[in-house]
Amino acid sequence: MKYCLLCLVVALSGCQTNDTIASCKGPIFPLNVGRWQPTPSDLQLRNSGGRYDGA
């Protein structure tokens, strides 16, 4: 019974925090924005590493 009461107190105390929810601002990938251009070999399926049967 003491263990259940302790778990209940810990769970309810976690609900009383006043911290704001973390949020991201800005672009998803802020490094090297607009500097990378794919080459034709980057766009071919055989270089993707997955299974490709050509069908």
From Swiss-Prot:
Record's keyword annotation contains Membrane: yes
Where this protein primarily resides, as one coarse class? membrane
Question: What cellular component terms from Gene Ontology apply here?
Answer: cell outer membrane
Q: What is this protein called?
A: Outer membrane lipoprotein virB7
Q: Which Pfam family is one of those matched by this entry?
A: VirB7
Which InterPro entries does this chain map to? VirB7
Where are the S-diacylglycerol cysteine lipid anchors? Answer: 15
